[in-house]
Amino acid sequence: MTAAENPFVSDTSSLQSQLKEKEKELLAAKAEVEALRTNEELKDRVFKELRENVRKLEEKLGATENQVDQKELERKKLEEEKEDALAAQDAAEEALRRVYTHQQDDDSLPLESIIAPLESQIKIHKHEISALQEDKKALERLTKSKESALLEAERILRSALERALIVEEVQNHNFELRRQIEICQDENKFLEKINRQKVLEIEKLSQSIVELEEAILAGGTAANAVRDYRRQISQLNDEKRTLERELARVKVSASRVALAVANEWKDENDRVMPVKQWLEERRILHGEMQKLKDKLAVSERTAKAESQLKERLKLRLKTIEDGLKGPNTFFVSPTTKTEKSGKILGFLTSGGGSKKRSSSQLRGSVTGRIHAMNQPIDRVGESDEMENSKITANGLTDQHEEDSERKTEEDGNVYSEDMVSGFLYDRLQKEVIALRKLCESKEGTINAKNEEIKMLLKKVDALTKAIEVETKKAKREAAAREKENALAMLNEESKLCRKAKLPRSRIPNPRCQ
């Protein structure tokens, strides 16, 4: 079989050729690696040599600096010697002048014998000064050459340090990239773990939401039953009060009828005075005033409870609005948020069973509970209205306290999980709307209560005015009766005085006067 007939042979040959090419590439890569290693070694050697050269140059620089310092000291010494020589020259000239003056005075000593040694000393000092100046110039040239060599060494050292810094920066950058890769891998693992925990917690929360819905429905039915019983008790109490008032009115009317019947066959002077009737009416009026005062106190307490409830509802509404605004501050991408809300809704709607409900069923239960909370209660009479309003205020405050606690717990759970689903958002929005409606209804009831309080105050004022009128009328009637009695007594005494015909009638009678 030839290579054309057998495809395996061609494949193996192509694979062998590819293997050879890969081996060549591997050898080339190894050669490059070796070249890079040799370059690195050469660079290290060059760095070492440069460091040695720099160290040697620094030593030479130190030595030259020491030499320069020594030369400076020598130069200072020479300058001092020069100054001393100049001072000696001046002293010699002064001595020459003196000698010259003395020679003029006394020609005993020759002038050349004194000047010759001084001139020889001056020449020697001048020669030393010129030699020192030449040494100084040579030292300056040497220092300049040393400084140029030192600058060149500093430039070479700086370039070597820059290369070393570049290499170190590349190595540090590589190490930082490796560390960031490890951190990203750890974060990825941690996020996967948190995602699994969030899914499990969402399932638990959905189950707890269903249980809370059932508990809320059961609590609503129990609260409605208690409210019905309280309303029935208040109705019975109001019926009892109305019957008592009717009985008192019947008694008053019966006493009036009996008084009228008793006074029909009597004279004007012998008629029974309506004091008992007045006292009875006064007692009844005082009783009604006391009842009105009690109703006023009850209405004030109810208004106070309504205001407290209104403040609590406002505070709760504010907290719910802040809670609804709060989740927007979380750092959650929109895609992950939609995925989480879709998972929650899918979990709530896909699973079967009697314990799981849809969002529409939950909205129906919540609206039914809100409707049960906002049911109007029948009122019978003014007192029934007051007491029923008190009962409803107490019931609503208790129920709203429970709702507020439950909502705070739910809000805390939702915020602690760092997510808010569309399901819970709809539910919270429904409850916010219900609370706003409840606040509006409560404001209406408070206004109605205020109007009723004003009407009751007007009635109390009217009753007080009527009582004052009745007291004034009774006082006027009592004064009129006293006047009539006094006039009757005077008439009787005048009649007796006229009928008396005895002589003692002449005696002045004080009654007749």
Curated annotation (Swiss-Prot):
The keyword Nucleus does not apply. Keywords: Cell wall biogenesis/degradation, Coiled coil, Cytoplasm, Cytoskeleton, Microtubule. Residues 9-18 have a biased composition (Polar residues). GO terms for molecular function: microtubule binding. It comes from the Eukaryota. Belongs to the MAP70 family. This is Microtubule-associated protein 70-5. It comes from Arabidopsis thaliana (Mouse-ear cress). Pfam families: MAP70.
